[in-house]
Amino acid sequence: CLQILKKGQKSMARNDGIDRTLARNQDLETPDDVTKVQEHNEREKDRYSNVDIVPERTALNVHFKSPTDDYVKMFEQMEQDKIISTRGLKPDAVKYGELVFDVNSAYFYNHGGYEFAKQFYADAYKAAVEIVGGEQYILSAVMHADERNRGNVGSSGVRMCTTITSCGLYPGGGETNPVVEAMQG
């Protein structure tokens, strides 16, 4: 859950007493992109270029849905089992998506800390399952509690976010992510 600010964009953690949430839908265009996201989300690397990951805190991460295999193989199995179909899609259609919910740490620490964060993201996960039409369309959902939040002065500096990685194909057709549509709705 690395927050990369665009030029002129302010950090969520501004220490101004206002709680902020960032929901970002990221298209994953190639299987290589999916593999990189999996390595990050599932903490499969021995070393990270992201210096904000604190390996000693990785045990605090919470899976709301653990992957049963690597993400690309899971997607392929879903196709074989006819849970999803890619028939008729344009060759350049995006098949995978990642939805990141990021909330400034102070919000959690002011409302009950780690346990509150776990419940918050459990509820977000339940909503995502309902919106996409079932848990079978979600490959993995994990709350990261092992990343520093350098911009959050006055808190413990731990950033908590959850990432929901899904196949980009949902019941009823279409290539848009209904989670994001519902949030924007």
PLM region spans:
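N-terminal nicking endonuclease/strand-transfer module with a His-rich metal-binding environment
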Residues: 1-185
